[in-house]
């Protein structure tokens, strides 16, 4: 299963995918349902980690509807 880190912002977000094969894919994308569907909708089920923010609730629900496993965390990891 791929692991995806998603740094959400109001207009544009950063995406980092670590594939099962160890490949790292980094992208910037507009923060919208349409772009998340276009970029992540066709990918196999992945584990996605989101930083908790004002955008994270609707994004998490949308990504779960696309079939992904979504976790949200605070900005500070200890």
Each language-model region and where it sits:
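Phosphate- and other anionic-substrate recognition elements at nucleic-acid/protein interfaces
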Residues: 1-78
């Amino acid at each position: 299963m791929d692991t995806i880190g998603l740094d959400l912002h109001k207009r544009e977000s950063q995406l980092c995918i670590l594939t099962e094969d160890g490949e790292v894919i980094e992208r910037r994308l507009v923060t919208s349902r349409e772009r998340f569907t276009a970029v992540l909708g066709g990918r196999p089920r992945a584990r996605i980690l989101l930083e908790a923010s004002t955008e994270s609730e609707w994004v998490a629900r949308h990504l779960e509807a696309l079939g992904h496993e979504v976790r949200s965390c605070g900005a500070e990891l200890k």
